[in-house]
Amino acid sequence: MGSLKDELLKGIWHAFTALDLDHSGKVSKSQLKVLSHNLCTVLKVPHDPVALEEHFRDDDEGPVSNQGYMPYLNKFILEKVQDNFDKIEFNRMCWTLCVKKNLTKNPLFITEEDAFKIWVIFNFLSEDKYPLIIVPEEIEYLLKKLTEAMGVSWQQEQFENYKINFDDSKDGLSAWELIELVGNGQFSKGMDRQTVSMAINEVFNELILDVLKQGYMIKKGHRRKNWTERWFVLKPHIISYYVSEDLKDKKGDILLDENCCVESLPDKDGKKCLFLIKCFDKTFEISASDKKKKQEWIQAIHSTIHLLKLGSPPPHKEARQRRKELRKKLLAEQEELERQMKELQIANENKQQELEAVRKKLEEAASRAAEEEKKRLQTQVELQARFSTELEREKLIRQQMEEQVAQKSSELEQYLQRVRELEDMYLKLQEALEDERQARQDEETVRKLQARLLEEESSKRAELEKWHLEQQQAIQTTEAEKQELENQRVIKEQALQEALEQLQQLELERKQALEQYEGVKKKLEMAAKMTKSWKDKVAHHEGLIRLIEPGSKNAHLITNWGPAAFTQAELEERQKSWKEKKTTE
């Protein structure tokens, strides 16, 4: 029902458009009433004047004012349509309403009846969208069918040239442009009007009237058993046969269903090219004009029965549906491709923008890189100059350090030499101290010896003086005693002489001791000087190798010859050592 409704709407659209004089999409209510009445008549739909008047009343409460004409058309007409009306009569009524307004005034190579058939074929082949157009693929299909029906070869190159000159702003042709294209003879050059008209009629019969095959054949009668020539017309559910091809005198029908079959028969009774059509209640024997026609009819009937078994539509409708689905698929693919292309274009534009942004960024980066490279080179030059300066300074510092190291090495060597010298000085100082100690011991011994000699000398002097006094006293006492005293004097003089000699000897020994003492004193002074000299050297060297410290606050010892060459602690240590030696002696 949906397909039938779509086909009916195409014819109604033409009629409605013809009534829309100002192309505003609106038609007067009186005209719509007339159109609706005519549609109900040709479509054999019960006509309800009350519903019609209710729908088209003058106030604004009716459905037309709110929803337009389509709701009424669907509800009151199209939904009630049955497949029992005359399609040709319906199309002719719609054609009558629109032909005068739209058909070209240019002279055509075809009749108005042929133009009507082209118009109906257009509605069959047009796309299911409004305004109605026929696309170039369907135009090519129709022109091929017409050319084939005229018995001439198809000029594909001519059609390709036509498509090249086709208006790119349009997706296809309108019904009136298609009529003008067929009627101007552009694709039927060399053909007479009758041939073109026959071709249009043949294509019309196939596409619109569902005529699958037609032609003259001889049929055997059922009652009289005679053979009579009839004009046979094969349709999807029926084979009708007429007296002639004008279809005015119909003689009967052969109803086809899935249980029918067709068989080839051998020649008999002088009849050739026989075949048999078996139906549920009847069998029909038919004779074709030749074997080719026989085979074509058998094949056509067999294909029709096979389609009935499958429940498939006629081949031309199925082919139309396949072409539409293919175009729909191609259109969807094209739309998808266009969408993808648009997305790709957008993506490309985005990419271009991104690339432009990247290019700008790269240019900026290149500029920054160049600037940075310039700065880097400048920095590198500065760094190289600084590095060279640093290198020179480092070399100078290294040289200075090497010199300092050499100097320090030299100073260290000198320091080590001074240390060695200081060690030698310490040893020599030790030896000098030992010599001084020995000299002091010798001095002490000589001093003690000298003191003892002085004591002995003093004792001898005292004794001599005593003897001298005694001698003087003895001289003064008596002369007698003088002799004795003389003797004693002589003895005493001898003794005195001996004492003098001893005294001289002692004096000599004292002088020797004094000389020895002077020698020892000189040696002691020399040792003291040597000790002082070594101490000064040691102090000097020690001052070179040790930190400067506060000087000692201990007072120097004073001897007969000046400041002592030793400290109080050293003196105490030596006194302790002398006492220990005395104790051991």
UniProtKB/Swiss-Prot annotation:
It comes from the Eukaryota. One of its GO terms (cellular component) is plasma membrane. Residues 210-306 form the PH domain. It is found in: Cytoplasm; Cell membrane; Nucleus; Cell projection, Lamellipodium. Residues 316-532 form a coiled coil. SMART domains: PH. Gene3D superfamilies: Pleckstrin-homology domain (PH domain)/Phosphotyrosine-binding domain (PTB) (2.30.29.30). GO terms for molecular function: DNA binding. Tyrosine-phosphorylated. Changing residue 230 to C: Abolishes binding to phosphatidylinositol 3,4,5-trisphosphate and blocks formation of membrane ruffles. Keywords: Cell membrane, Cell projection, Coiled coil, Cytoplasm, DNA-binding, Membrane, Nucleus, Phosphoprotein. Its main location: cytoplasm. InterPro entries: EF-hand-dom_pair, PH-like_dom_sf, PH_domain. Changing residue 291 to A: Abolishes binding to phosphatidylinositol 3,4,5-trisphosphate and blocks formation of membrane ruffles. The PH domain is essential for phosphatidylinositol 3,4,5-trisphosphate binding. Phosphatidylinositol 3,4,5-trisphosphate-dependent guanine nucleotide exchange factor (GEF) which, independently of RAS, transduces signals from tyrosine kinase receptors to RAC. It also mediates signaling of membrane ruffling. Regulates the actin cytoskeleton as an effector or adapter protein in response to agonist stimulated phosphatidylinositol (3,4)-bisphosphate production and cell protrusion. This is Switch-associated protein 70. It comes from Bos taurus (Bovine).
